[in-house]
Amino acid sequence: MANDKIVIHGARAHNLKNIDVTIPRDQLVVVTGLSGSGKSSLAFDTLYAEGQRRYVESLSAYARQFLGQMDKPDVDSIDGLSPAISIDQKTTSKNPRSTVGTVTEINDYLRLLYARCGHPICPNDHVEITSQSVEQMVDQVLELPERSKIQILSPVIYQKKGQHKKVFEHIQKEGYVRVRVDGEIYDISEVPELEKNKKHDIAIVIDRIIIKEGIRSRLFDSFEAALRLADGYAVVDVIGQEEMLFSEHYACPYCGFTVGELEPRLFSFNAPFGACPECDGLGIKLAVDEDLVIPDRSLTLREGALVPWNPISSQYYPQMLEQFCLSFGIDMDTPFEKLSKEEQQLILHGSNGRTFHFHYENDFGGVRDVEVPFEGVLNNIYRRYHETNSDFTRDQMRLYMTELTCSHCHGYRLNEQALAVKVGGIHLGELSEKSIQDALAFLEQLSLTEQETMIAKPILKEIKDRLTFLQNVGLGYLTLSRAARTLSGGEAQRIRLATQIGSNLSGVLYILDEPSIGLHQRDNDRLLDSLRKMRDLGNTLIVVEHDEDTMRAADYLIDIGPGAGQHGGEVVAYGTPQEVSENPNSLTGQYLSGKRKIPVPKERRKGNGKKITVVEASENNLQNITVDFPLATFTAVTGVSGSGKSTLVNEILKKALQQKVSRSHAKPGKHKKITGFESIEKVIDIDQSPIGRTPRSNPATYTSVFDDIRDLFAQTNEAKVHGYKKGRFSFNVKGGRCEACKGDGIIKIEMHFLPDVYVPCEVCHGKRYNSETLEVHYKGKNIAEILEMTVEDALEFFKHIPKIKRKLQTIVDVGLGYVTLGQPATTLSGGEAQRMKLASELHRSSNGRNFYILDEPTTGLHAEDIARLLKVLQRLVDNGNTVLVIEHNLDVIKCADYLIDLGPEGGAGGGTILATGTPEAVAKVSTSFTGQYLQKILNK
């Protein structure tokens, strides 16, 4: 059989319908189709799973126990398979120690660069700290012009107060006759008495020499004597020139600041040797945040200005506060902001040892009657956070704490010694703070000595290659110090992609999950070039993608469908993008050929005249911008990757609104103020996180339709005869559920050296309920059979029950009719979870004062899904609500009522408002990249 194809026979993972697929090797292959059609089942759960399993199978049983086992995918055979590497979006590191630099391994090379070519500079005296042997010192002095006059000095005292009489006695005993005191040369017997309270410098004059031939051995002796007397330091005073400083140690000859030998571990913030001792290399420290403790300073103490001390379950702290205020004469009915500075300090930081009488009786008769100092609210929270053994108390105290930049290392994570070492005039912390684009430019023009250039050449090549790859996948705006946990899924995936390109492997099967997410159209071409480069190295790329540019760039396109869930799982079309676009059965093909498209709305909403305004936003790269968000409109925030969209919407607007409207503890990013929030009642963030963390959560429970279904079952005659209430039909509580599997329907069996096996429960056979409960029927079906229904079937089944029908209809409206009511939440994709949340919002009665925020809602969505999503979003706005999206997808952007375009670039080059207004207005702004692409699509 030819080796130029991967041939799959009988793939049945999830909803795949026993399909046969042939995929050409060493090509860029795009797998597309509706959300839920089976693309990921083919790419990840079949191809990747089998490629990985075969590799792991080849290892010893001992090694396999550490790697974890993979199930054999449900497929008859796969031929022509290569070792598989999956680059998805879910495996982003949440470790606070992971940064862009560590994930890409650039930090490893930078540490090597600084260890081999770094110059330690004393932070106090700003002189270079060098370590030299006596021979090197002598050689350096002999390079001076002939007949130069020099004095070799031994600096025994540097900037120390005192008269130093014993020092002079010791010098005399050693037989030396001249000393230099505070820059003046004296005979040892004629040294004036020094001022006791002034700092002085004292150096012994070891030798006076004129540079000429034959003095080498004399220099050796003089240096050795100088170094011995001054603990490894020597100074050469060249008459008429600057002094030369020498040290046997990596230590400053003036203040003694020591660096030690330069080695790579000194520059690692994850090693005790290099980490800042104050923050342990995290760059941040937890501190109690005054703004979270007193979010509203216009309140009085009696009205609850101190949020952590408001009476919830105990009166202990409220009574303490009242008795303290009485004792110290503080008025509890004055707004906190109007209290004097001293009174505020007392409340926040404590009485500094001054006591007051505290009497307290608890509900159980316990009495406390003591004279105590007042601890202060901030100190109290900090102490309780660190001393408590209760997770609940620690979590509660954590709500009032925030991460502040470490004052010791200024957020650079490294200790003082590591930060003293510089290459090109900057230390590693400063280089890590530069954007990838700027770091590359800095290294390109780095000037090194001839010897350093030879050492640094291979190191710099590796660093520059990796930085270039990151820039080529549109990440030039990120800094190397950026924490990995703060990256979006798309950014994290492209970082791993850049790392793989850097590895230069060939013959590998790469499987990618929507690499274009979070990428502006402008950056897409560079990403595609990177993918082609990987292909040209001799790799097979299988990309699950909906982006039109990526599909058109593919060598081979596979369309899975025709629908989603049970309506999908078949190969609808395959071939070149041109061949697929000509296939009448392919939805993707119809969008590619332009036969189907998402229409531009006939008119744009003007809103209700009200707006929310964020004033002077300056978090991250935002340049002090003031932004209006019109209410009762569909608004999109656009801009190139890294321009500040997420900072503006997620870090400032969302958190500020949650703080004002929902009384949340979230602390918004830097801004002056926010106005207009009185016009909204709820802030709802509809993201792509799972709707539940356990298999017990499912669409029926999440949308609360299961409550109505259980009510219905409790009203049947059979249920009434047995006295069953609504709770009998829950699989989460004792009573109606199967106790053998606790309502899970499956039992986990742990296997050593093999994957854990999940088997259906032998008692209930996977039904989740006991036999008595399953005897209760509604219209011929029991509760377990209802959970096995798809939403579409359930809609037909319950069409005469308005309450249930309304909730199920909204799930169908968002395109999830194929999902079963009992499908575990953990098996829903991000896009499906997000649409389930939208469905849940749609069936709730709303007064039209909700503010919905969606961050890239088109992730994982086909053009047909996007058309459905837009209908749902427009429905929410038609009801008077406000919908705000962060989006790159032009089909969504062109349908918005109002755009806010940030830019012009990412990182430091972004953060300003380029254009606002309707899509038509933004399309006319020549400086806006979004506008340039919009113009093309609006003119189609």
Language model segments and positions:
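Conserved phosphate-binding elements of NTP-dependent enzyme cores
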Residues: M1-K940
